[in-house]
């Protein structure tokens, strides 16, 4: 039920050997805000007491994105959801991109590095193969951590977002960014073969899965 799995997860968090009360402390920091206080004032939230009996739909409202991924992993393993367990590695890469963006880090640095040697999930390979991206190009681009993270984010968005309205808005944003803002001074990069090849790579993905002809997609 919607309470049991959260209780189990918070029990694990409270008694974790390496990082005890990590999720509890994160929740405790948030409940002071007026937004969260309306929902969580009915719970006895104390940073030194184990939190219990919060339904999953309210629990998901207050945890951070990284804690959501950890909870997803716990949930998938608890219920032996093999397909979902395989997504954990994809989500971990997305967390890295999210953290970089949240801290205003430059996400376009070090695009020439080959710093990710882990084999990508077969679902990602199929996703890219459907874009007519050759194996050597896939291997080359996914060997860069940042390109891999952006690729995984685009893939997972396509997999889990079901709202037509959200999809339409995000697809419009992607097209405006990729074919508008990024192209506004493309002459600056005429001699930069690395950036041109990366642009071509993402161009194929966007044209396949995020076409500006939105009604055909959603």
Give the ranges of each region predicted by the language model.
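Short, contiguous, well-structured surface segments enriched in hydrophobic/aromatic residues
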Residues: 1-86, 108-109, 144, 159-166
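Polyanionic, low-complexity intrinsically disordered segments
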Residues: 59, 69-97, 103-218
């Amino acid at each position: 039920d919607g309470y049991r799995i959260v209780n189990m997860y918070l029990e694990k968090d409270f008694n974790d050997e390496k990082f005890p009360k990590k999720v509890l402390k994160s929740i405790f920091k948030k409940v002071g805000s007026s937004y969260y206080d309306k929902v969580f004032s009915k719970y006895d939230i104390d940073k030194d007491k184990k939190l219990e009996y919060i339904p999953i739909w309210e629990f998901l409202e207050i945890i951070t994105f990284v804690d959501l991924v950890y909870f997803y992993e716990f949930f998938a393993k608890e219920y032996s959801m093999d397909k979902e367990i395989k997504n954990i590695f994809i989500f971990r890469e997305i967390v890295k991109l999210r953290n970089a963006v949240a801290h205003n880090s430059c996400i376009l640095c070090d695009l020439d590095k080959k710093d990710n040697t882990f084999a990508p999930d077969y679902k990602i390979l199929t996703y890219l193969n459907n874009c007519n991206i050759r194996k050597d190009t896939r291997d080359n681009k996914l060997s860069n951590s940042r390109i891999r993270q952006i690729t995984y984010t685009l893939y997972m968005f396509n997999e889990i977002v079901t709202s037509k309205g959200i999809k339409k808005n995000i697809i419009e944003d992607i097209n405006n960014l990729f074919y508008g803002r990024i192209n506004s001074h493309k002459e600056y990069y005429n001699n930069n073969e690395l950036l041109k090849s990366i642009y071509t790579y993402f161009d194929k993905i966007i044209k396949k899965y995020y076409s500006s002809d939105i009604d055909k997609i959603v």
